[in-house]
């Protein structure tokens, strides 16, 4: 798991190793790579390809975290300082770029066009979701539909891709690939819905995050959208 991540992370540029290693070593639930590995196992995938793809997914996720923290001006994540708080915005953004490009190097190594297609579409969707979220910020008119579209693109699509590329790696028939994609999509939607609720209800000692960060950043998530709807 983490050993393979660290091995594939290495760069000749020391600062890239420092920043990328810092955020990966900070922990996290590894839900997205776990989705790849569990879906691949469920479909009987053989060989090392699922492990390689799990690293791809984790690198892309980590890149999005590096960029997100800069966009959101965040200085804490998982109870520790963010990379941008330690090294500055430029170092964090450029290290995120490195992780994106390294993930595509690994996909070329996998040499499966179907996997490349899914991941190219997913990374494009994530970027669109981030921009849509930016457009929604500080907008009291955001609807439930607009909110759901943001979480579908910025969160759910990577879970969807994780499950779908596992099915491709297992040489599963097209119907099973579609079913795995649908499962990943649902998992990602539920994950983000719960995460957004926890922003209002979680214990900071347990979650490692302060309460009300989304509200402070002007992000209208579903709890706020419902509250504003019911409160008028």
Question: Residue ranges of each PLM-predicted region?
Answer:
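Mg2+-dependent prenyl diphosphate-binding active-site environment of isoprenoid biosynthetic enzymes
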Residues: 6-232
């Amino acid at each position: 798991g983490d050993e393979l991540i660290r091995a594939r992370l290495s760069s000749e540029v020391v600062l890239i190793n420092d920043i990328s290693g810092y955020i990966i070593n900070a922990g996290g639930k590894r839900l997205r790579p776990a989705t790849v590995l569990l879906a691949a196992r469920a479909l009987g995938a053989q060989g090392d390809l699922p492990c390689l793809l799990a690293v791809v997914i984790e690198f892309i996720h980590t890149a999005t975290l590096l960029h997100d923290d800069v966009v959101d001006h965040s200085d804490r994540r998982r109870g520790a300082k963010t990379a941008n708080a330690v090294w500055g915005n430029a170092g964090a953004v450029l290290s995120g770029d490195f992780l994106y490009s390294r993930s595509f190097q690994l996909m070329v190594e996998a040499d499966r066009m179907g996997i490349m297609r899914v991941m190219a579409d997913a990374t494009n969707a994530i970027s669109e979701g981030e921009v849509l979220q930016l457009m929604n910020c500080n907008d009291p008119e955001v609807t439930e539909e607009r909110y759901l579209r943001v979480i579908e693109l910025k969160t759910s699509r990577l879970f969807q891709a994780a499950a779908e590329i596992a099915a491709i790696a297992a040489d599963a028939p097209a119907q099973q690939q579609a079913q795995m994609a649908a499962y990943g999509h649902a998992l990602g939607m539920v994950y983000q819905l719960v995460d957004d609720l926890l922003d209002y209800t979680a214990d900071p000692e347990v979650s490692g995050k302060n309460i009300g960060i989304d509200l402070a950043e002007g992000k209208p998530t579903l709890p706020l959208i419902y509250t504003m709807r019911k409160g008028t």
